[in-house]
Amino acid sequence: MKTVNRTTFAIFLAGLWAGASVAIGADASPATGRKVINFNRDWKFAKGDLQAAETLEFDDSSWTEVRLPHDWAIAGPFNPAENGYAGKLPWKGVGWYRKTFTLDDSGGNRRVYFDFDGVMAFPKVYINGELAGQWDYGYMSFRVDATDHIRTGRNVIAVRADTTRHGTRWYPGAGIYRKVVMTICEAVHISHWATFITTPE
């Protein structure tokens, strides 16, 4: 009986997890008005510390089209002279990502956020040529408030990743190596990571 109960419970948990996964990619919730949009497709990438790559007018037509998550170092080449702890791959350097997208009129006082699950390393995020946010690490997720920089119609988001200052004892990767979502919500909303479960025990 215990085996049956454990199996049933495992199936129940799997169902809950699947339902949550579907909800993340769904349209705006009728109850909250919150909309979470997968932002992993249609990015362009170039390696190198390029000047003015954050601006609206920058020509990225020659850049490589990529889909997130993306790690520029795995393209190689391997360097036998490098230490093996980092895979002998060229992960040190600067890389730029750009994505052009269109935002419809929200029709109200909305907030727009970009949630990055991981960018290696020291990322700077620009919206329409303006610095919207930055993060001083590479392994943790972070949120950028784009509300004051976004506009109705055409927009460009640009991300600069710099691994030159990052130290490691293992292979860290390089670039936007985890997923990104754009979250649109009402002006009054529950903030990111603001829900908690407590117990008197």
Q: PLM ranges: what are they?
A:
Residues 1-6:
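N-terminal secretory signal peptides that target proteins for export/translocation
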Residues 8-11, 38, 44, 57, ...:
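Intrinsic disorder/low-structure terminal segments
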Residues 8-21:
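Bacterial N-terminal signal peptides
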Residues 24-84, 88, 102, 156-162, ...:
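Accessory carbohydrate-binding/adhesion or oligomerization-edge regions at the termini
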Residues 49, 92-200:
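Accessory beta-strand-rich segments of carbohydrate-active enzymes
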